[in-house]
């Protein structure tokens, strides 16, 4: 995460963790992956282990594969969810998010990329990656947008479960 300069790091971290909390609250599949944890990319943030211990423990640790969907274990884990609609966020948007998004679109998935739950080394790199994904057919969204879309109504069970997660993101 420390590579990100396109968005405030703490905001991005809070957004990514909110997505994980929402997935757990709504009993949605959560597939985590990392690349070269013991090298320059480093491990996933430890807060994910607290929020989603089973998913963190079962994360797909890629051995340098840039496009996560080129990794057979990750591709199998995504397919095993049985879902055709994917919500994707990652660090960095211009590497770790763009390529699996493009591949997922080619494979017929509907993809929403949560732009503010990831970032890139520069604003320009982020903008280019987001434009490329959008022009290929992904829907760009924000953390607040996707959480409220999943809520549908604050009176619904999903809305009730997501209220504290969304509320924690409101600037004070």
At which residue positions do the language-model features occur?
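A short glycine-rich beta-strand->turn/loop micro-motif centered on a GG-aromatic cluster
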Residues: 87-90, 110-123
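Generic beta-sheet signal
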Residues: 33, 114-116, 143
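Short gly/pro/ser/thr-enriched loop/turn and capping motifs at secondary-structure boundaries
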Residues: 67, 94-95, 118-123, 147-148
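Internal catalytic-core helix/loop-beta-alpha segment
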Residues: 62-102, 106
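Active-site acidic carboxylates
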Residues: 1-64, 110, 127-135, 139, ...
């Amino acid at each position: 995460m420390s590579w990100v300069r396109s968005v405030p790091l703490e905001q991005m971290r809070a957004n990514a963790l909110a997505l994980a909390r929402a997935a757990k609250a709504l009993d949605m599949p959560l597939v985590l992956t990392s690349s070269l944890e013991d090298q320059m990319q480093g491990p996933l943030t430890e807060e994910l282990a607290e929020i989603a211990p089973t998913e963190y423990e079962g994360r797909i640790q890629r051995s340098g594969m840039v496009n996560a969907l080129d990794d057979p274990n990750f591709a199998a884990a995504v397919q095993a969810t049985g879902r055709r609609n994917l919500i994707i966020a990652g660090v960095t948007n211009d590497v770790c998010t763009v390529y699996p998004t493009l591949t997922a679109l080619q494979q017929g998935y509907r993809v929403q990329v949560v732009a503010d739950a990831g970032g890139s080394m520069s604003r320009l790199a982020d903008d280019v990656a987001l434009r490329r994904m959008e022009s290929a057919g992904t829907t760009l969204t924000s953390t607040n947008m996707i959480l409220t879309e999943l809520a549908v109504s604050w009176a619904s069970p999903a809305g009730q479960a997501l209220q504290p997660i969304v509320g924690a993101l409101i600037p004070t």
